[in-house]
């Protein structure tokens, strides 16, 4: 099993898609990349902690290649906008990838290079060593599955799921 810690806007969005991805055994929403030793949702949203909203995606490489997990990541958010994803604005929504090993760092950098051709502006995704992963509050775990009718889910997450179905249907569970 391998785990990638990825930030691409609101963690609910990435969580919703990766929860439906073949070979993914766990998705945990959380915070990382900042200086606050005890972040919570409200402090992270204040923009004062330096943390990003992220997901820790654990997957089985025997079922899904790491490159597919990373290419999905770049397809599911706009990695060319600094500190923003759509209406979600602030450093907590930055495009980010946090590595624990040199191998992961190389995979992340290769994914950026591979996906740059798909974008007309430079990718600004931050690639940093994972300092510590802080699990988000239970309310944020598997949010879409618990609240599919909520407005944010309908307007923001559903289009991302549709995009995943269009481009990655072979990798999604029915």
From Swiss-Prot:
The lineage of its organism: Bacteria, Bacillati, Actinomycetota, Actinomycetes, Micrococcales. Keywords: Oxidoreductase. Belongs to the MsrA Met sulfoxide reductase family. One of its GO terms (biological process) is protein modification process. Has an important function as a repair enzyme for proteins that have been inactivated by oxidation. Catalyzes the reversible oxidation-reduction of methionine sulfoxide in proteins to methionine. This is Peptide methionine sulfoxide reductase MsrA. It catalyses: L-methionyl-[protein] + [thioredoxin]-disulfide + H2O = L-methionyl-(S)-S-oxide-[protein] + [thioredoxin]-dithiol; [thioredoxin]-disulfide + L-methionine + H2O = L-methionine (S)-S-oxide + [thioredoxin]-dithiol. GO terms for molecular function: L-methionine:thioredoxin-disulfide S-oxidoreductase activity; peptide-methionine (S)-S-oxide reductase activity. It is an enzyme of class 1 (oxidoreductase). The active site is at residue 10. Its EC number is 1.8.4.11. Signal peptide: none annotated. It comes from Pseudarthrobacter chlorophenolicus (strain ATCC 700700 / DSM 12829 / CIP 107037 / JCM 12360 / KCTC 9906 / NCIMB 13794 / A6).
